[in-house]
Amino acid sequence: MTAAATRKLVRAYYERFNAQDVEGFLDLLTPDVVHEISQGGSEKGRAKFRAFLLRMNRCYRERVSDLAIMTDADGGRAAAEFRLDGRYLETDGDFLPASGQRYRLRVGAFFVIREGRIARISNHYNLKDWLRQVQR
């Protein structure tokens, strides 16, 4: 896959994220996708990723902007940096109670691409900053 094709794939990933298009989002992933959650472990497979997306869409309303995508020369790896603006709508597990709190974070993500699809996603953001913002 070329670097340009990888940039297009990663951009499509975030477009579908913004649209909350779960099935379209999953179409971009390999069946055995590995999702490394910021400060929270790792999950494998589309079914687990689907469950993650459905929970996120229920508990949060988020939008990616100011997206910068970088790739290696052959398009096998990519990185993205972006701003994430969100609202915390429904209490998520053991986190603080949700009441529509707004937040804004800088996020970094890393991707491995295999056969034209995303095979690994690793997201990184400052959880302490998020907690500070939603405690207000």
Task: Tell where the protein language model's regions lie, with residue ranges.
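C-terminal and inter-domain tail/linker signature
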Residues: 1-136
